[in-house]
Amino acid sequence: MGKLGKPVTQRQLRVGEMIKQALSMIFLKDEAKLPNIQTKGITVTEVRMSPDLKTAKTFVLPLGGINSDETVESLKEFSFVIRKTLSRKINMKFLPKLLFVKDESFDYAEKIENLIKQTNK
């Protein structure tokens, strides 16, 4: 389910997955040439597309979770450069605006796992 309880369309999922794969390759090969960012250690965990496909909420996690807030802020700062590099990889009429967000799902899962372990003792 998407925002406001609307189901996510197949097109949103397909475009989100396409952008996720392209961004992963851009970061892995360091194609965007971003200063002061070690892009090889950035994992793109999920990309959620808006219903109009104009915005891509991109969940990222730096390797080891070290300096994750600083890395996300740097990605936000250089999102134009990343978007320009992405436009060379993906053929779309309108390339979506990239919003980078720190993925906290792994931290949340670890917290839940620890709570379950405590209750089982």
Question: How would you label these PLM feature ranges?
Answer:
Residues 1-55, 61-121:
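Charge-rich, low-complexity N-terminal segments
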